[in-house]
């Protein structure tokens, strides 16, 4: 009788072992097998104050400051990308629908992948600290008459090493990645609005 119980127990273990080694059709396994992990994610670790201003004219902060980090999609190190472009534009209204006349979107800073030399304390990933004086923003728009209060929209573009079908570098920005990456996990809105007191 003891032999029969042992034989049944061994048979159950063998059947369970063989069935656990077979390929799974579960949705999570399909996700892991089919998801594209190429590319990188740009995270905003710190963002500017809600209101910035000009030196001598305001008590508000006089710098546009961001701390950003980049993570490779598949977790490898260092991340593979070409550069991060920081573009700005000033609007008359908070919903960024009426731009200030003569103040188009401009690239105010380009950060090459080789410039990401520091490691963030938050995630131990390559990071870069951006600090642009508000006076430099104003001088980027010579001759423009600014309203007393404007709304500065900062757009980030992450230029990848991968090429699209036309042979151009893939660029992630607020138009094609903001919705999927703006949540708390990714913390990557690609677009940031700041009130600018002129």
Give residue spans per PLM region.
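Sec-dependent bacterial lipoprotein signal peptides
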Residues: 1-20
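Acidic/polar, low-complexity intrinsically disordered N-terminal segments immediately downstream
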Residues: 4, 22-118, 150-155, 164-169, ...
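Short, charged low-complexity linear motifs
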Residues: 6-9, 174-179
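Signal that preferentially marks extracellular ectodomain short beta-strand elements
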Residues: 115-154
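Extracellular recognition modules
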Residues: 159-161
């Amino acid at each position: 009788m003891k032999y029969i119980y042992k034989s049944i127990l061994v048979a159950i273990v063998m059947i369970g072992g063989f069935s656990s080694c077979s390929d799974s059709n579960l949705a999570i396994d399909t996700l892991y097998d089919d998801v594209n992990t190429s590319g990188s994610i740009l995270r905003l670790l710190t963002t500017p104050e809600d209101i910035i201003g000009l030196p001598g004219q305001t008590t508000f902060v006089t710098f546009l400051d961001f701390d950003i980090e980049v993570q490779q999609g598949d977790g490898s190190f260092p991340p593979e990308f070409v550069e991060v472009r920081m573009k700005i534009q000033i609007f008359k209204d908070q919903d960024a629908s009426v731009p200030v006349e003569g103040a188009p979107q401009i690239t105010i800073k380009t950060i090459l992948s080789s410039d990401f030399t520091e490691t963030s304390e938050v995630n131990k990933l390559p990071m870069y600290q951006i600090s642009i004086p508000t006076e430099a923003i104003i001088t980027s728009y010579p001759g423009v008459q600014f309203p007393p209060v404007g709304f500065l929209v900062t757009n980030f573009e992450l230029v990848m090493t991968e090429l699209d079908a036309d042979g151009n570098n893939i660029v992630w920005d607020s138009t094609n990645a903001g919705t999927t990456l703006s949540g708390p996990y990714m913390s990557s809105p690609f677009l940031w609005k700041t009130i600018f007191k002129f």
